[in-house]
Swiss-Prot record:
It comes from the Bacteria. Mg(2+) 2 binds at E66. It is found in: Cytoplasm. Homodimer which binds Holliday junction (HJ) DNA. The HJ becomes 2-fold symmetrical on binding to RuvC with unstacked arms; it has a different conformation from HJ DNA in complex with RuvA. In the full resolvosome a probable DNA-RuvA(4)-RuvB(12)-RuvC(2) complex forms which resolves the HJ. It is an enzyme of class 3 (hydrolase). Its EC number is 3.1.21.10. This is Crossover junction endodeoxyribonuclease RuvC. It comes from Ehrlichia canis (strain Jake).
Length: 156
């Protein structure tokens, strides 16, 4: 079974795909980046098209992402919701079931601490999968939610 974890954002949407059989293997990951000089509609369309390409490249059985939370900055929350909406629409159109988890639940399932910092989540994702990531936390956050899904569904 392959599950995609998604970390939505209008600027950067992280994604990670896990193969879950007797063990868990990371089989793909990346970031969908948009140009902030483009209109929101153009940026959302890019997220939509790139997600379709990713989904068509792997046999995805389910998807997971964090539930919406209200950020201190209302504009950030609105942009996040735009990206989430496009992801949910795209996944639904491709008949991929989406599972959502609270941020605290994801952190607790990966680190043992529901209030862990991004650095701790990143470190544990690397440790669990025996891989090393460079760059932003978008990828490790996406993989963390996919791992959380695997753990919560006892899929391995």
């Amino acid at each position: 079974m392959n599950v995609i974890g998604l970390d939505p954002g209008l600027n950067h949407t992280g994604w990670g795909i896990l193969s879950i059989e007797k063990d868990i293997k990371l089989i793909g990951n990346g970031v969908i980046k948009t140009n902030n000089k483009e209109t929101p509609g153009q940026r959302l369309n890019k997220i939509h098209k790139e997600l379709i390409n990713i989904l068509n490249s792997y046999q995805i059985n389910s998807a997971s992402m964090e539930e919406v939370f209200i950020n201190k900055n209302p504009r950030s929350s609105i942009s996040l919701c735009y990206a989430r909406g496009v992801l949910l629409l795209t996944l639904n159109a491709m008949n991929i079931q989406v599972f959502e988890y609270s941020s605290n639940y994801v952190k607790k399932s990966i680190t043992g601490n529901g209030h862990a910092k991004k650095e701790q989540v990143h470190f544990m994702v690397e440790k669990i999968l025996n891989v090393e990531f460079k760059g932003t936390y978008d990828i490790s956050d996406a993989i963390a939610v996919a791992l959380c899904h695997a753990y919560s569904k006892n899929n391995f």
